[in-house]
């Protein structure tokens, strides 16, 4: 019965192929002793080998020739190791031809050794088991004693026996590991030594090969790279950086990164060219990055370093420094914005616009704390040169008669302003704040048509007719739409003259000794009606007193706002009841002579210039301090953005 049932497992084995073989070394008997003395003992251990894989049992010390281990291990069978046996069984051709000779890879070799404390371990015996013979007997567990033999070519001796249990198993989930293990077989001893040093086992493919198909590394596009990838994996692994697929968009590859990445993607030749590949041969953005991701499944994730962040923080300061440098320049007034907070606003710009819209007879008006650039100084010199152009242009320029009306109101104050403008050093404009109303078109026309006149040109035009002055006053009023002359417009223009100061209205004031009271001017034109004849004295006195009062305001550091053109008439009407109070306040300047007034004005001007220099020094210090803060610790400037000024 037993003889009939034995072939059935063999027939069943034709339909079942194992993937692993499990070997259990139980014990040995009759081993030769290697120690000296009467009771010879040995320190025995057994080396178990299938193909290129080896395992070793523990050492049983001082055994009398019968050690017991009871240790097991599992070996992975090479792909196709039992296919020949299966085909031979199906064809009844006997044993497979590869089962003997140099191609007999499916053998279990058991080598028993004696451990020597000094020198090389001594050989005790060797047993070779053909796995195909065991598999032919059936797939059940086989426990059997095998005789130990001497080394090939040595004299045969009695060396004892060893008992081993062999059982075949199958793991369906690891079928793809056959192909991977075949590619791992042709490894050099040098690579295995490196694996031991690195603490790696089979290139760490045991955990990943079970889920990868066997054709993953057989891509025809990869060519020799798929076959040589593991053989050269040790050399590439230390120098390989992250592939292009794992790099961030903000990180740029350096020369070393490009060379290492390109060298890891393309294999051209066996050996050295892999390690010394130039980055110019292939780009790190090539399509081979995808192949690299397939070959090396254990890619590190990209972590952004401080160099990526630092390259982004240092993109903005150069532009801010350029804007700050432009602010320090005299001709550039560009504002600097740091993190939404305006450090330098164009607040000094409105005085510059006033300077461009001021008519010729008036000095440039600017803020008391503003530092005038070169362009503003040149504009101030040109406006100072045109200081005495108010009374000129009666026949040459009819487009600006209203401005000439404003330039003939206080002769004494105008003369003091002229001499002061002549004595000022070059580049120091007269800084006063006056309620002036003029149009930019009139300024452009006056600058184009009026020639350069002297400082004392006013004395040649003291004979202007009162009717002509009234007509110009009506035109110079901002609210008048036409050039028509009427008594009402004439009186309105003279009333407007009361609200202005430092005007250049002609007055017969002696230049030898100025009088505190205005004198009626002499005119060569026919005299008009008596109401118009009485107004010049009142208007001149009012203009002089208001001018002195505003001079007091300027010297004390006050700043007067510029009235809009639409509010001029209302301002004239509201200032009429205050004329008496203005005269009382300006009475302390009546006893001063012309030279004393000029000296007082020059003294105040020097004080203002010193204050401007001090302000400029402070601004320069703040600029340098801000640049230093931006260079050293820019985080101090990260404040919440405020509303635009």
Curated annotation (Swiss-Prot):
Biased composition (Polar residues): 277-286
Membrane-topology descriptor: Peripheral membrane protein
Biased composition (Basic and acidic residues): 375-387
Keyword annotations from UniProtKB, A to Z: Cytoplasm, Cytoplasmic vesicle, Endosome, Golgi apparatus, Membrane, Mitochondrion, Phosphoprotein, Protein transport, Transport
Gene3D superfamilies registered for this protein in UniProt: 1.20.5.2440, C2 domain (2.60.40.150)
Modification Phosphoserine occurs at: 176, 283, 286, 307, 357, 367, 391, 395, 486, 530, 539, 545, 640
Pfam families for the chain: C2, RBD-FIP
GO process annotations (BP): cellular response to type II interferon; insulin secretion involved in cellular response to glucose stimulus; postsynaptic neurotransmitter receptor internalization; regulated exocytosis
Location of the region described as Disordered in the Swiss-Prot/TrEMBL record: 271-299, 341-550
Domain FIP-RBD: start-end pairs: 578-640
Domain notes: Binds to vesicles enriched in neutral phospholipids via its C2 domain. The interaction is favored by Mg(2+) rather than Ca(2+).
Protein name in UniProt: Rab11 family-interacting protein 5
Native species: Mus musculus (Mouse)
Lineage, broadest ranks: Eukaryota, Metazoa, Chordata, Craniata, Vertebrata
Gene behind this protein: Rab11fip5
């Amino acid at each position: 019965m037993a003889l009939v049932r034995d072939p059935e497992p063999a027939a069943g084995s034709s339909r079942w192929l194992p993937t692993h073989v499990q070997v259990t070394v139980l014990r040995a008997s009759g081993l030769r002793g290697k120690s000296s003395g009467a009771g010879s003992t040995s320190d025995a251990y057994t080396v178990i080998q299938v193909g290129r894989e080896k395992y070793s049992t523990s050492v049983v010390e001082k055994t009398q020739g019968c050690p017991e281990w009871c240790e097991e291990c599992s070996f992975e069978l090479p792909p196709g190791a039992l296919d020949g046996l299966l085909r031979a069984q199906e064809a009844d051709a006997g044993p497979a031809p590869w089962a003997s000779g140099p191609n007999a890879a499916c053998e279990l070799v058991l080598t028993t050794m004696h451990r020597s404390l000094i020198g090389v371990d001594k050989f005790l015996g060797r047993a070779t088991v053909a796995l195909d013979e065991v598999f032919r007997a059936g797939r059940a567990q086989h426990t059997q004693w095998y005789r130990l033999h001497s080394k090939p070519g040595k004299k045969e001796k009695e060396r004892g026996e060893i008992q081993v249990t062999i059982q075949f198993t199958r793991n369906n989930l690891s079928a793809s590991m056959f192909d991977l293990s075949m590619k791992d077989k042709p490894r050099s001893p040098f690579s295995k030594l490196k694996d031991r040093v690195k603490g790696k086992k089979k290139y760490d493919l045991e955990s990943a090969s079970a889920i990868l198909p066997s054709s993953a590394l057989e891509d025809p596009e990869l060519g020799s790279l798929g076959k040589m990838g593991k053989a050269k994996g040790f050399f590439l692994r230390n120098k390989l950086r992250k592939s292009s697929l794992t790099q961030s968009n903000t990180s740029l590859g350096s020369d070393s990164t490009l060379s290492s990445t390109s060298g890891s993607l393309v294999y051209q030749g066996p050996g050295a060219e892999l390690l010394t590949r130039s980055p110019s041969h292939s780009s790190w953005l090539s399509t081979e990055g995808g192949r690299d991701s397939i070959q090396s499944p254990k890619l590190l994730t990209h972590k952004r370093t401080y160099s990526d962040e630092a390259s982004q923080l240092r993109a903005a300061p150069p532009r801010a420094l350029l804007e700050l440098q432009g602010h320090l320049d005299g001709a550039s007034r560009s504002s600097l914005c740091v993190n939404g907070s305006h450090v330098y606003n164009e607040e000094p710009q409105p005085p510059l616009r006033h300077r461009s819209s001021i008519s010729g007879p008036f000095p440039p008006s600017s803020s008391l704390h503003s530092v005038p650039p070169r362009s503003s100084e040149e504009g101030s010199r040109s406006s100072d040169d045109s200081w005495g152009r108010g009374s000129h242009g009666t026949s040459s320029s009819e487009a600006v008669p209203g401005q000439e009306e404003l330039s003939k109101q206080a002769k004494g104050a105008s003369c003091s302003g002229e001499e002061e403008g002549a004595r000022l050093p070059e580049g120091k404009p007269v800084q006063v704040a006056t309620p002036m109303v003029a149009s930019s078109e009139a300024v452009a026309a006056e600058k184009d048509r009026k020639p350069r006149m002297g400082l004392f040109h006013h004395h040649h035009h003291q004979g202007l007719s009162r009717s002509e002055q009234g007509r110009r006053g009506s035109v110079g009023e901002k609210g008048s739409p036409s050039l028509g002359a009427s008594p009402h417009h004439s009186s309105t223009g003279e009333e407007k003259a009361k609200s202005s100061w430092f005007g250049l209205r002609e007055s017969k004031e002696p230049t030898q000794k100025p009088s505190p009271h205005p004198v009626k001017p002499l005119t060569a034109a026919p005299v008009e009606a008596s109401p118009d004849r009485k107004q010049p004295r009142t208007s001149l006195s009012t203009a002089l007193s208001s001018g002195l009062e505003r001079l007091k305001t300027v010297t004390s550091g006050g700043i007067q706002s510029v009235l809009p053109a639409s509010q001029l008439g209302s301002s004239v009407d509201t200032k009429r009841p205050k004329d008496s109070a203005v005269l009382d306040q300006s009475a302390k300047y009546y006893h001063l002579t012309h030279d004393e007034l000029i000296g007082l004005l020059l003294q105040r001007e020097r004080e203002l210039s010193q204050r401007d220099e001090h302000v400029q020094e402070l601004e320069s210090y703040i600029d340098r301090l801000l640049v230093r803060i931006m260079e050293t610790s820019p985080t101090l400037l990260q404040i919440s953005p405020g509303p635009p000024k």
